[in-house]
Structures are given as structure tokens and as C-alpha cells.
Amino acid sequence: TNGTAVLGLGDIGPLAAKPVMEGKCMLFKHFSGINAFDIEIDTTDPEEFIAAVKRIAPTFGGINLEDIKAPECFEIERRLVEELDIPVMHDDQHGTAIIASAALINAMHLSGKRIDEAQIVVNGAGAAAIACARMFLALGARRDQITMCDSRGVVTTRRTDLNSVKREFATDRPV
């Protein structure tokens, strides 16, 4: 982590994010027997972060990214997946998307509907929300039936303040 997006706390920096990272390490050990080590990297520059992870990667069997702000987290994860020969996971994206997808699948089962019939509202447009929306698409949801909201309202094609990741889910439907 670089501590730029700690849940409920925001950008608190790498040292302040240490307790969260230590807690994740305990969960890895307790539930899977995997020894994990917290590593806090003191930079907000994606290139520096990527370079630091690449330098230490040979020591580890996998990398779990955590609490890195969007949209930088997407580029960091993409590059590390491409450039390293060990598994790389961004917990804020993938962990949340897995749980939300399980809930969506269950809701579809209980309602007797198919996922491609669902009208889905994603409240948020950060790393977790984007990953959830992408996972919903992979499960069969229709892009034109996903409405994403951020702190400024519905993410629409008419807005000029969207980064490239938010534009992926911008809607042109009247909402």
C-alpha cells in the first residue's frame, strides 16, 4: 500500500495504513495458512510504486495490493500483472467484486430473474465500484442496464469531469 485510499479514512499515508495491512496479514495466515508481510511504500507516484514492487517481487510468491487510490490503482495493478511472473491481486477491486457478485447472483436466484434482466445501480466510482461493474458484465449483465454514481451524481456521457475509467461506465440514457 501507499495509504492513499484507506476505507473510511482516505489518503492517510503509508505509515498510518500499517495497521490495516497488518490486519490483512493476520487474515491471510488465519484463513489460508499463508504467511504475509505488510509493506508500506512511501510514494504517490505510480511509476515509483511499480518500480519498488518489482524490485522486491522475487522474494514473494504473490502480491496483494491494498488501499491505493483510483484511478492510479488500475494502472499499477495492470502493469504489475503484465510485468511480474507471480500472482497480483488488488484486494479493494477483486475482493469486493467477488462478494458483490455473490450477492447479485443470489438476488437473481431469489427474484427468479436472469442477470441480463437486472437494472443495476453502482453507488460509487472508485476501484471497488469499477471492479464490481466489470465483474457484473462478466457474469452477463448488460452495460446499458448499469447506472454508476459518484460524488457528483450519475456518471453520464455528458459530463466532462470523468477519468478514462469512469468513462467506461458513463451512460447516455436519461436518468
Language-model segments: which ranges?
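N-terminal ligand-binding/catalytic initiation module
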Residues: 1-87
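Glycine-rich phosphate/diphosphate-binding loop of Rossmann-like nucleotide-binding domains
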Residues: 7-32, 90, 98-175
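Residues at the C-termini of beta-strands that transition into short coil/loop
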Residues: 40-42, 92, 150
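Short, glycine/acidic-enriched loop or turn micro-motifs at the edges of active sites
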Residues: 69-70, 94-95, 153
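Short, acidic/small-residue loops that bind anionic groups at enzyme active sites
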Residues: 83-97
